[in-house]
Swiss-Prot record:
This is Increased recombination centers protein 22-2. Residues 211-221 have a biased composition (Polar residues). It is found in: Endoplasmic reticulum membrane. It is a single-pass type I membrane protein. Belongs to the IRC22 family. Keywords: Endoplasmic reticulum, Membrane, Signal, Transmembrane, Transmembrane helix. Residues 202-222 are annotated as: Disordered. Is probably involved in a pathway contributing to genomic integrity. Its main location: endoplasmic reticulum. Pfam families: TRAP_alpha (PF03896).
Length: 239
């Protein structure tokens, strides 16, 4: 089988299976396809995978060819469905594989990487493998895998969060500065108290007496001494 013929048929099949639903009559093939999740190989079909947005999930496929003729793996795709109503939520990007030829009675392995980026909810992942056989492209669905998808927890030390915090802090500081320059200075000038001027000690005036005073020969003021006391002193001097 020519490779150009395979790729042409593969491209035509992708164009005609929009929504990944095959058209025409269904055919039974003896090709077994299974996969494991390399990050969590212990998960089975009955388990529920737990993924976070931003994760990269690697599906490792095993294709067993039990047909009597050679087959060729040429592509892989898939879809996430709502497990309750079986509605398709999103389709995976179709990826090219190989092509990888698988002789009768043999098996091959290949990987598919899936970037998780969905609204947090419960989903069922159903991969599809494109097989070329006898100049025909066959779309073979694989088993479903239930998965719960949540948003990744944001660490306080995440560089993206730190950068955002710095931007917000600088912006906030800039707004405060502009507001102070426009309104703050004028406001504080209007409400600030006026400081009283200090008078120096050299300019301070000395106390002034309010009434006449008499200074005795002894050198002190006699105005405050009782009159009777002064008379007694005079009498003693006469004697």
């Amino acid at each position: 089988m020519k490779l150009s013929t395979i790729f042409t048929a593969f491209a035509a099949t992708i164009a005609t299976v929009a929504g990944y639903e095959t058209t025409g009559s269904k055919q039974t093939v003896d090709i077994l396809i299974d996969y494991i999740i390399k990050e969590t190989p212990e998960l089975s079909q009955n388990d529920v995978a737990n993924w976070e947005n931003g994760d990269t999930v690697t599906l490792q496929y095993v294709v067993n060819n039990n047909e009597e003729s050679e087959i060729t793996v040429v592509g892989v795709t898939g879809q996430f469905k709502n497990p309750i109503n079986n509605e398709i939520v999103t389709n995976l990007t179709t990826g090219k594989v190989g092509p990888i030829a698988v002789p009768p009675g043999e098996a091959i392995k290949f990987d598919q990487k899936i970037n998780v980026d969905l609204i947090p909810a419960n989903y069922e992942l159903i991969p599809h493998v494109f097989i070329a056989q006898d100049s025909l492209i066959k779309v073979i669905p694989c088993r479903g895998q239930l998965a719960t998808i949540v948003d990744a927890a944001v660490s306080f030390f995440d560089p993206r969060l730190i950068f955002l915090e710095l931007v917000l802090l600088i912006t906030f500081a800039g707004l405060i500065y502009v507001g102070y320059e426009i309104w703050g200075k004028q406001y504080f000038k209007g409400v600030a108290p006026v400081k009283a001027k200090k008078v120096s000690a050299a300019k301070a005036s000395s106390p002034v007496a309010t009434g006449p005073s008499t200074t005795s020969a002894t050198g002190y003021d006699t105005n405050w001494i009782p009159e009777s006391h002064l008379k007694q002193k005079k009498t003693k001097k006469v004697n």
